[in-house]
Amino acid sequence: MKKLLSLFLTVAMACSLAVTASAAEEPAAAASDPDLTGSIVILHTHDVHGGIAGYAQVAAQKQYYQKCGAYVLLFDAGDFIQGDPTVSASQGETAVELMNLAGYDAAALGNHEFDYGYDNLVKLSRTAKFPI
């Protein structure tokens, strides 16, 4: 039984190497960026709940569509200042700073934007480079 299993694994490994080697030899098709001149692209996030790891990807998407010639709008539909320990510890300031860097154009208020009180919300709206 061990010999049969060993033979099976050897054949499976050889097949996977052969498939991988042949795939590497084929040239990848060159993907060209689409011409989106005159187009409007709307990107949005919602219920991020302090998940700050995704803001770099959001910024990259906005930059990509701008590079393709599109006019890009980036919005958030609320609940961005609570959830992640880093964002919660700063009472949303970290999220707003990252949203500034990502190039958000506007953000709506969700119920969690009121978790730290009205005064904090006013402070965050002054820090933001976009209307909240």
What are the functions of these language-model segments?
Residues 2-23:
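Sec-dependent N-terminal signal peptides of Gram-positive bacterial secreted proteins and lipoproteins
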Residues 24-132:
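Acidic, metal/ion-coordinating pockets
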